[in-house]
Each structure stands twice: as C-alpha cells, then as structure tokens.
Amino acid sequence: SKQTFHADIVILAMGSEAGKLSGMNESRYHILKQLQLKVIEPLPSLVQFYTSPVLKVLKGVRVKGTFSLMENDKCIHQEKGELLFTDYGVSGIAVMQLSSFYKKHHQYQLYIDFFDELSHNQLCQYLSQQSSLFLEGMLNHKIASYFQKYQDLPIQKLAFLLKHYRLDIQGIREAQYAQVMKGGLSLEDVTYDLELKRYPSMFAIGEILNVAGMCGGYNLHFALASAYRVAQAIERNVYVKNS
C-alpha cells in the first residue's frame, strides 16, 4: 500500500516460504537487505530428495533401516528410521532429517542399509540359507522383487549391496514441500533478546531468523520461544522507560 506508519516497537515476524503453494517470494528478504542486514541464503529444509535412479517400481513402499548422507566417501550425517520411496526420489522422516545437512553445489549420495540390525557376516549367513527363497520374508516383497536381478551375485557382494545401496542425490524439493526454511536473518545482527543491533526497538522472531531445527516440533517451539523472549524484552524496556 506504500503507506507510512510510525511505531515505538517493530517486530519482524514474516515467516518463510516453507509449505506455501505460491512458491518463492523473497520480498521479506529484500526488506532485510534494504535495512543493510545480513541475510543467509534461504534454502528448503526438512524436505524430500530428488534421486538418481528414481525407483518408481517401489513408489509408496516404506522401509526401516539406517540411512547415510555421504560426500566423497565421508559420512555427513546418519539417521536410523523410515524411508519412503516416491516417483521423484525419497521421502520420510529420516530423509527430511538428512536434508537439514544439504548444501547447494555439493555432490551427495544416499546410502541405504536395509539390514542395519545385522552385521555383514550375519547377513551373508542368512543369505546363504535362502537359496530358492531369495530375500522372501526378509524384505518387503516389492523390494525383494527389485533385488531379484542381483541374485546371481556372490553372497559377499550381495550383502554389501544390501547394506550400502546407493542413490545419487540430484537435489532437494522446492520450498512448497518443505516443513521449514533454513537461512534468513543472520544471528550476528541480533542481540540475545533478538533485538536488531543496528535498529534498537526492532526485533525478529521465528522463521525469518537463520534458525532451523530437526523434525520433532523444534521449529514450532522456537517460533513460540522467540516470541516469548521478545515479549519479555519489550516488557522490561517499557518498565524501565516508565519508571
């Protein structure tokens, strides 16, 4: 509306694009930059991965195991939990947790351990007893059917494949599919009370700040806790001003 308003206290509570069907709208970050504040590039977090290959034959199949985000043979982060195969890549809580560690312009791989409760040798022993019943009863039947093409591999190699199945990560899904955005107003620009150092009596709360937690309600908690922190600071300031 281009109207001008005057206020004693301003709170920046603009949120983010996470979960919004309208896609990316960086006007909130443009406002911060106009105020000469440091903005960390926003990026979807707690979001699904695009992968190669895409295992469309397993679409809708969930699997429990241990999942590792790798780069150059180095484990960036590992999650134990559940993964969901989709028609674009992978989803599930474990995948969303791993996405928190994703950075642009990096080449990541996702390694799936379908048998994380068994050591390599224990799995070899189980496989040697399967003979004609290849993986039947050991994995979801669709996953077992998918791995049928590897049944002629030596048991040692097959066991390794099942404990280190690799998918190349092609990227993360867009902001509209994310639960939260990482990036935003740098914490270097705010005080302990979330007051802008450059602009006294201006505060920032919630997802506009460069704070992003893991799954489990941590981001909702931060939104509420940051609002409470600012409310306390404002109350103190008003009390001091009026005393």
Model-derived regions, located:
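Short hydrophobic core segments
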Residues: 4-23, 32-33, 83-88, 202-204, ...
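A conserved FAD-binding loop/helix module that cradles the flavin
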Residues: 20-31, 35, 196, 210-239
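Glycine-rich loop(s) and the adjacent beta-strand/alpha-helix scaffold that form part
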Residues: 9-55
